[in-house]
């Protein structure tokens, strides 16, 4: 979907303008419009006649789902009719992870079961991929909504750095370890919802890597992997729960260290690692960080 039109009332027009301003859209003059704005390759124009909004660009579908519906119209129906996208609303597990690319902190993997009723509820609540949510408070608020949804099933595992490093020494490959984690979560969800026929995850490796991990746990269901899997509501909900567990650990680690433990693998991360080692010795690093990262060598001069 690269174009969409929807009617708005006066209050929704005002609300949409405020939302666009908050998201950093650039407003431009355009004939016959109340206002017109653009950001990247997305254009949003509200026309006087109607009034109605015209959304154009490759991010049209995301804008409808993550901005227009939850923040402006309050109706989760635009472009998501169940007839047009039955798999989105059919019973399935969605799996996602958080912390994979961060030197500090755990690898958190979460799974969520959804069906048609649950999916409609989550869309209306504004559930979206955690990477689109900018604050920890918002992540926690959305996570609470997910957990309180009637009929939902979910599971989250957090591989704290000590356990992560132990497992990595065994697997010696991040994708195989991720597959084991995904399979572990799917196994628990299958215990809760044994009739669920399908699981969906973001594609992080060849399909056979995860299929092999599932076979080792005697799990038989249809597995789908795709890029941008988080566009699926179940996967998006899983991303929120995984992120919540990750930021909770990072907050606790910051308190324990006595200074901010940063995200990512930046120079600030290296500085924080050196500060930890200076205060507590190099052996403490394995309690805070993923030691196979090249960042370890930058911190200690050695690659574990």
Please state what every model-predicted region is:
Residues 1-304:
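RNase H-like, Mg2+-dependent phosphodiesterase core
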């Amino acid at each position: 979907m690269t174009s969409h039109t929807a009617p708005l009332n006066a209050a929704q027009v005002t609300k949409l303008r405020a939302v666009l301003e908050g998201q950093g859209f650039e407003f431009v003059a355009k004939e016959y419009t109340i206002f017109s704005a653009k950001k990247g390759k997305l254009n949003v124009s509200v026309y006087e006649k109607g009034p109605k909004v015209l959304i154009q660009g490759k991010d049209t579908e995301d804008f409808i789902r993550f901005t227009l519906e939850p923040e402006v119209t309050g109706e989760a129906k635009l472009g998501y009719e169940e007839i047009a996208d039955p798999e989105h609303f059919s019973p399935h597990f969605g799996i996602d992870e958080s912390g994979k690319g961060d030197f500090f902190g755990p690898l958190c993997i979460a799974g969520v079961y959804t069906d048609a009723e649950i999916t409609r509820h989550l869309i209306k609540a504004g559930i979206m991929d955690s990477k689109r949510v900018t604050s920890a408070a918002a992540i926690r608020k959305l996570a609470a909504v997910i957990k309180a949804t009637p009929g939902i099933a979910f599971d989250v595992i957090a591989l704290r750095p000590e356990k992560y490093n132990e497992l990595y020494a065994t697997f010696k490959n991040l994708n195989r370890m991720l597959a084991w984690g995904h399979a572990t979560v799917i196994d628990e969800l299958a215990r809760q919802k044994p009739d669920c026929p399908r699981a969906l995850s973001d594609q992080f490796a060849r399909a056979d890597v995860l299929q092999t991990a599932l076979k080792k746990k005697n799990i038989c269901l249809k597995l789908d992997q795709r890029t941008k899997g988080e566009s699926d509501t179940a996967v998006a909900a899983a991303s929120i729960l995984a992120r919540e567990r990750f930021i909770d650990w990072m907050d606790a680690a910051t308190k324990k260290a006595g200074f901010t433990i940063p995200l990512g693998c930046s120079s600030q991360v290296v500085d924080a690692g050196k500060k930890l080692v200076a205060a507590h010795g190099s052996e403490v690093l394995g309690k805070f960080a993923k030691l196979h990262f090249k960042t370890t060598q930058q911190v200690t001069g050695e690659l574990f």
